[in-house]
Regions:
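N-terminal secretory signal peptides that target proteins for export/translocation
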Residues: 1-9
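Sec-dependent N-terminal signal peptides
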Residues: 9-20
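C-terminal motif of bacterial Sec signal peptides marking the signal peptidase cleavage site
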Residues: 23-27
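PPIase-associated folding chaperone regions across multiple families
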Residues: 30-41, 48, 139-208, 251-356
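N-terminal targeting/tethering segments
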Residues: 33-145
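Extracytoplasmic/secreted proteins, especially bacterial periplasmic and envelope-associated proteins
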Residues: 53, 57-64, 86-95, 99-107, ...
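Sec/Tat-exported extracytoplasmic proteins
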Residues: 62-69, 99, 103, 107-116, ...
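Peptidyl-prolyl cis-trans isomerase
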Residues: 214-255, 289-290
């Protein structure tokens, strides 16, 4: 539950403000009507109504992400398996979704009469100039974008931010300590599933489940009698021994209702959820620092819910035209030049500079 540093805040702002990580809104394009076409202008990947996204814009965000991930995890990260696809495939899907969403948000902002001031337009030009000045000749050639086009992209990003701010302004700033409360607990876990011979997780039989419930009750009785909870974890639990820190939004409702009423050192009875049974000991019923941090997480989650209610209703009416085969040239496995400038960090430094 760490908060973002000021340097990183702008990098994740648009999507973090909607309670998701950068490029993690895969599936947004499913809310609009998709149509494959060959009728787009040269260099365009898709259009949402009259708002186009260019191949150069996709290359910019791809270059930004590709360099960051490779610097952190190495070049082989793209081959890593993620479910039924690779990390490269997953990131490409998320890049597509991010671009669909960005263009949709710009249209929505314009439909609501949101416009940029002359000062904001000037800041967009400053950001574009700084970005272009930091590109190597090789990176500039790969990008294939003029300073004017990049200025327009920074303006669109600003419009999207303004839209989120306007739509989510009704979210109250005050989040109670109890709503945001983070606690520390130890728990004994009894899974209601088992590993089948073919490697799948399957539900326990009725007889097996009855045995598990009996063991859970035995553990609860021993805990109530004063036996060492750590030793009981070692004896009974299907999960590692130790303590965990959780908020209300991390857990099943039945678990929340049973555990968040416990005081320090108090122990629950047997708690049953869909997937497991638990016996829980409360180590600390209020972690102050973590609770304060969690308030911002909750605030952003509420903003996300409000924003997407309006956004999804708006984009459901829009028509998207996709260039047939256009995305084949945009791939994280393709060669991309090194780039020392970051679109998001420049946006943050220009639009959210600390007052002097």
């Amino acid at each position: 539950m760490k908060s973002l540093s000021k340097k990183k805040r702008g990098k994740f702002w648009l999507l973090a403000a909607m309670c998701v990580l950068l490029l993690c809104c895969a599936g947004c394009k499913d809310d609009v009507q998709l149509k494959l076409t060959t009728g787009l202008n040269e260099g365009e990947l898709f259009r949402i109504e009259k708002k186009a996204c260019t191949e150069a814009e996709a290359r910019l965000f791809l270059m930004n992400q590709k360099n960051e991930y490779e610097n952190t995890y190495g070049e082989n990260i793209w081959k890593a398996e993620v479910g039924e696809t690779t990390f490269a495939g997953q990131m490409k899907d998320q890049l597509q979704a991010f671009l669909y969403q960005l263009k949709g948000m710009v249209l929505m902002a314009e439909s609501r009469g949101i416009t940029l001031s002359d000062e904001e337009k000037g800041l967009a030009a400053v950001a574009a100039k700084e970005y272009m000045a930091g590109l190597s000749v090789e990176a500039a050639s790969y990008l294939g974008m003029t300073e004017e086009q990049l200025t327009q992209l920074y303006q669109e990003y600003r419009l999207a931010e303004r839209l989120v701010t306007q739509v989510t302004a009704i979210v109250e700033d005050e989040i109670s300590d109890d709503e945001a409360r983070v606690i520390e607990v130890q728990q004994i876990v009894f899974s209601k599933k088992k590993l089948a011979e073919d490697g799948r997780l399957v539900a326990l039989s009725a007889t097996e489940l009855a045995d598990v419930r009996a063991k859970a009750q035995e553990a609860a009785d021993r805990a109530a009698a004063g036996d060492s909870f750590t030793l009981l974890q070692e004896t009974y639990s299907s999960e590692p021994v130790g303590s965990i820190r959780v908020s209300r939004f991390d857990v099943d409702k039945a678990w929340e209702n049973a555990v968040f009423v416990l005081g320090k050192e108090e122990i629950s009875g047997v708690i049953e959820t869909e997937d497991a049974l638990y016996v829980v000991r409360c180590v600390n019923n209020l972690l102050g620092e973590e609770t304060q941090t969690n308030k911002e997480v909750i605030r952003q989650r509420k903003k996300a819910q409000i924003f997407y209610q309006e956004y999804n209703a708006y984009v459901a009416k829009l028509l998207v035209q996709n260039k047939e085969g256009g995305w084949q040239s945009v791939a994280f496995t393709n060669w991309v030049p090194d780039c020392d400038v970051d679109f998001y960090e420049i946006y943050e430094s220009v639009f959210h500079a600390d007052p002097q």
